[in-house]
Amino acid sequence: MAHIFVYGTLKRGQPNHKVMLDQSHGLATFRGRGCTVESFPLVIAGEHNIPWLLHLPGKGHCVAGEIYEVDEQMLRFLDDFEGCPSMYQRTALQVRVLEWEGAGGPGDSVQCFVYSTATYAPEWLFLPYHKNYDSEGPHGLRYNPRENR
């Protein structure tokens, strides 16, 4: 089992969360809420208003999200779903635990895999940086789901 940190459309209440619930993809168990220990730019970009965590540690904000425990089958599914390694890259980072469900929490922080990108258009650096993504947020950039494209 591995921990993953989701900050965008895979979070509860967001457009792609349904894939986290579909056990045909593998197992994903919600463990808690957290935020990245390091700051990163989280931008909304492209014609489909996709949230992107730019792999630029030290810039932007500590990004809020959710921590899941996933099995190997779900991890492989998510790699494919996130277009890893061409669109996003899966890297490990420390996540500060804000809330944990169940006994035996990991302590102050936990190492998680996250899908971020080091390949992006230069103008993305000038987009607004977000702390907490919500497709319906005040930014007005509603995510366009794959099934609508």
UniProtKB/Swiss-Prot annotation:
GO molecular function, one term: gamma-glutamylaminecyclotransferase activity
Enzyme Commission number(s) of this protein: 4.3.2.8
Residues the record marks as active site: E82
Keywords in alphabetical order: Lyase
Enzyme class: lyase
Lyase is among the record's keywords: yes
GO CC, one annotated term: cytosol
Similarity-based family: Belongs to the gamma-glutamylcyclotransferase family.
Protein name, as recorded: Gamma-glutamylaminecyclotransferase
Species the sequence originates in: Rattus norvegicus
Gene name of the encoded protein: Ggact
